[in-house]
Design a protein with these regions (language model features):
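Amphipathic, small/basic residue-rich leader segments at the start of a protein or domain
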Residues: 1-90, 111, 115, 337-340, ...
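Internal helix-loop-helix
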Residues: 51-119, 160-167, 299, 303-310, ...
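Glycine-rich phosphate/cofactor-binding loops in nucleotide/flavin-utilizing enzymes
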Residues: 5, 71, 76, 236-237, ...
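Glycine-rich beta->alpha junctions and the first turn(s) of the following alpha-helix
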Residues: 4-8, 197-302, 358, 391-392
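A short core secondary-structure module
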Residues: 148, 153-197
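C-terminal helix-coil-helix/basic helical segment that borders enzyme active sites and/or dimer interfaces
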Residues: 31-38, 282, 286-289, 293-343
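A short, Trp-centered hydrophobic/proline-enriched beta-strand micro-motif
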Residues: 119-127
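A structural signal for short hydrophobic beta-strand segments in well-ordered beta-sheet cores
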Residues: 141-144
Length: 392
C-alpha cells in the first residue's frame, strides 16, 4: 500500500490556494454561529456562492463530463470539511439529482438540474414514516392515480432540510396489495404544492429535521421517477450511497468511510481531552492514560474501516468513546460550544449528544450489522420471531 503524498502540480497548488481563499471569505464565524443556532446544516448565502463559482457542478459531475479531476476533487473535499461548510442539504441534493438524471424525463431534468448546479434548487429525502422504522419499504404514504396526476396522502419523519428545499424525493405506495418491494413508486414532489405542511423538530444534538404532512397533494405524472411500482430500482442506488455500500476507487483519493465528516468531531474531542489531561497532569494517572489511549486507538481503528464497515465502527466508537471523555473531563465538559467555562469548548458534549443519532441516520446499527452478516459473511437473515414455548 502506498502511503506517500499525492503529487500536486503548480495548477493543483493554485487551486488549493483559490479554494482556501474562497471558503475563508464565505464560511465566516457568523455563518458557523448561525448554523449552530438554527441546526440547519445549510446556509443559503454560502450555497449560492458555491453554485455561482461552479463548485457544485464540478463536484457533482464526473471528470469526463467536466467535473473535478481526482486530485482536485480530493483537495476540494478536504478543504470543504476543514472550513466546516454547512453540507447536509447539498449531500441529499447531489444524491437525489443522480436519480433525476438517471430516471427523470428530459423535461424534468431540464427543470431541476440547472438549478441544482446554480444552488437555487435543493432536494431532500422523504423516506421514513412515523411507524416505519428503518425499513423504508414498509411505506404507507399512498399515491393514487387520477388521470395525468397523482393524489398523495401520508406523512414522513426526518425529512432533513425540507424547509430549505424545493423538491422532496418521495417514496409512495401505489399498490397496497403487492409485495412491499413491488408496491413502491418514486416522485420528485415540488414542496410548494398545496397540501404540504412542514413542521420542524430539533434533535438532541441541536440539529433540525422535519415532519412533513401530505394531504391530497396533487402531483403531475411528469414528476414520477422510473416505472410505476418500480420505485425500488430507483431507490436502490441512493440508499447504497447513504449506507456507504459503494466500491472504493483504487487510487485511494477518497474517504475510507461515509461517516468521516462526523468522525472528525470525535477525533478532535479526543485530541482536546488528551491535551487537557496533559496540562493538568491527570495523564500521570495510569487509568486516565489507559482510557485516553483506548479512545485514540478506537478512533484510529474506526477511521481505517472502509465502506459500510466504517459506518458501523465509527458509530459504535462514538457511542463508546464520548461518555468516557465526559467522565474524564468532569462536569465542565457538559457545557456546549460557545459557553463560558466549557473545558474543551464543548467538543465532548457535542460528540456525546451526537453519538446516539449516528447509529440511526440512514438506518440503525442493527440494520447495517445484518447487512454485513448477510451480504459479506453469507449468513442467513436474522429471525426475530418469538421463541416457541414448549408445552408438556
Amino acid at each position: 500500500m502506498d502511503f506517500s503524498r499525492p503529487h500536486l502540480t503548480d495548477d493543483d497548488r493554485a487551486f488549493l490556494d483559490e479554494v482556501r481563499t474562497f471558503l475563508a471569505t464565505h464560511v465566516t464565524e457568523d455563518v458557523k454561529r448561525r448554523d449552530r443556532e438554527t441546526g440547519d446544516n445549510f446556509d443559503e448565502g454560502v450555497h449560492l456562492a458555491l453554485g455561482a463559482a461552479g463548485y457544485l457542478e464540478a463536484e457533482w459531475k464526473t471528470e469526463a463530463d467536466g467535473g473535478f479531476p481526482r486530485v482536485r476533487r480530493r483537495i476540494w473535499e478536504l478543504e470543504k470539511r476543514r472550513a466546516h461548510v454547512p453540507w447536509v442539504t447539498w449531500g441529499t441534493t447531489a444524491m437525489v439529482a443522480r436519480s433525476v438524471a438517471s430516471f427523470g424525463s428530459p423535461e424534468l431534468r431540464d427543470e431541476v438540474l440547472p438549478g441544482v448546479f446554480s444552488g437555487h434548487v435543493r432536494l431532500c429525502l422523504g423516506y421514513t414514516e412515523p411507524e416505519g422504522g428503518s425499513d423504508v419499504a414498509t411505506c404507507k404514504t399512498r399515491a393514487v392515480r387520477d388521470g395525468s396526476t397523482w393524489i398523495i396522502n401520508g406523512s414522513k419523519m426526518f425529512t432533513t432540510g425540507a424547509h430549505n428545499c424545493q423538491y422532496v424525493f418521495l417514496i409512495t405506495n401505489t399498490d397496497p396489495e403487492a409485495r412491499k418491494h413491488k408496491s413502491l413508486t418514486m416522485f420528485l414532489v415540488p414542496l410548494n404544492s398545496p397540501g404540504i405542511e412542514i413542521q420542524g423538530l430539533r434533535t438532541v444534538d441541536g440539529d433540525r429535521t422535519n415532519i412533513v404532512y401530505y394531504s391530497d397533494v396533487r402531483v403531475d405524472d411528469r414528476y414520477r421517477l422510473g416505472e410505476v411500482n418500480g420505485g425500488w430500482t430507483v431507490l436502490r442506488e441512493p440508499l447504497n450511497v447513504e449506507h456507504g455500500a459503494v466500491d472504493a476507487n483504487p487510487d485511494g483519493l477518497q474517504d475510507v468511510s461515509i461517516m468521516m465528516h462526523q468522525a472528525n468531531f470525535m477525533a478532535v474531542a479526543v485530541d482536546k481531552a488528551a491535551a487537557i489531561a496533559g496540562r493538568s497532569g491527570s495523564v500521570a494517572d495510569r487509568s486516565v492514560a489507559y482510557r485516553l489511549g483506548r479512545a485514540a486507538a478506537r478512533v484510529e481503528a474506526s477511521l481505517s474501516a472502509p465502506s459500510i464497515f466504517g459506518r458501523v465502527a465509527l458509530a459504535q466508537a462514538m457511542r463508546d468513546v464520548s461518555p468516557d471523555l465526559m467522565d474524564l473531563l468532569g462536569s465542565a465538559s457538559a457545557l456546549p460550544i460557545g459557553t463560558e467555562g466549557a473545558v474543551d469548548d464543548g467538543a465532548a458534549d457535542y460528540v456525546f449528544r451526537f453519538a446516539p443519532l449516528v447509529g440511526i441516520y440512514g438506518g440503525t446499527l442493527e440494520v447495517f450489522r445484518n447487512m454485513i452478516a448477510q451480504y459479506v459473511l453469507g449468513l442467513g437473515k436474522p429471525n426475530y420471531s418469538p421463541p416457541v414455548v414448549k408445552t408438556s
